[in-house]
A protein has these predicted regions:
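Polyanion-binding surfaces on beta-sheet-dominated domains and ring/shell assemblies
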Residues: 1-168
Length: 168
């Protein structure tokens, strides 16, 4: 977007169904839409959500759950959504863009949650790469078919021109 500093993008999202991790799902959908639109970006925006859940009733231990369901989100002690800018070509491959947290976590739990979300967002980025590769293959196939059709059309036009010359 540096080349087009005045470029503005408005994204409108409507929730049709919420099975959990809604914010990270919406952010990932926006990120993929921006990638597929061809807008030049410094990296890919990928996101993930993690929840801090009680593992047992009696011991009070807590564990992090990645990509929680809606039910898990409501039962969680805390949850956090992290958005990252991922660019494999730069020295800082993963930059934290922002977080949204609900509930209370200790400083250590926050660091663990961000690390878990970073790993998950990196996996989302790899999925985006697979989608983009597939789209490129489809485009190349379509383009190749178009070239083949153009060659057939040219041959057909040449044969018509030759027949027309022969009739004269």
């Amino acid at each position: 977007m540096e080349k087009n500093a005045s470029l503005g993008v408005i994204v409108s999202i409507q929730e049709l169904k919420n099975d959990g991790s809604f914010l990270s799902s919406a952010l990932n959908a926006c990120g993929l839409a921006l990638i597929l639109s061809g807008i030049e970006m410094k990296g890919w925006m990928c996101s993930a959500t993690a929840c801090l859940m009680k593992t047992g009733e009696e011991d009070g231990k807590l564990s992090l759950v990645l990509d929680p369901t809606r039910e898990e989100e409501t039962q969680a002690k805390a949850s956090m959504t992290c958005a990252f800018l991922i660019n494999e070509e730069t020295e800082d491959k993963t930059i934290l863009l922002g977080t949204k947290m609900r509930g209370k976590m200790t400083e250590m739990e926050v660091f663990e949650c961000v690390a878990l979300c970073r790993d998950a967002a990196t996996s989302v980025c790899k999925y985006f790469d697979q989608v983009l590769t597939l789209r490129e293959r489809e485009f190349e196939e379509r383009y190749r078919l178009t070239d083949e059709k153009m060659q057939m059309f040219k041959k057909m036009m040449e044969s018509i021109a030759e027949k027309t010359k022969a009739v004269k």
